[in-house]
């Protein structure tokens, strides 16, 4: 499992469901994750099973993310396939009190490095609501470029991507 300067990551387990429900229930957090319709306990139980199944199928998946300094879980992030296309997506979401502290960029970079170095991926995508400027600014800061606006789970979203070659060009060979 990867780690960054301030963050650790671990596989999600079925026992994480109550924490996941609590973390994603506030409106500021779930509004960019499909709202309460997609973040209710029943939907999250199904989603958690998908996250867990990705580990065995692909060797990576969405993970619990926590602070090394305290052990506190602060969100989820990871690499996973987009259900519609199979493209590998880097995703991240944080509890609101951990926003604007650089954790989004730190975890996204950690997963991009891992995807290109350890998983042999040639391209990674990211998806966000157009209104979620904080998320797509992280994508741009990581070197990802806008590709299109298209439907994702029936909702208009912006799609960004970065290739291994572009990542290495921006961040150097030491990142891989």
Each model region followed by its residue ranges:
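Active-site rim helix/loop that mediates acceptor-substrate recognition in acyltransferases
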Residues: 39-58
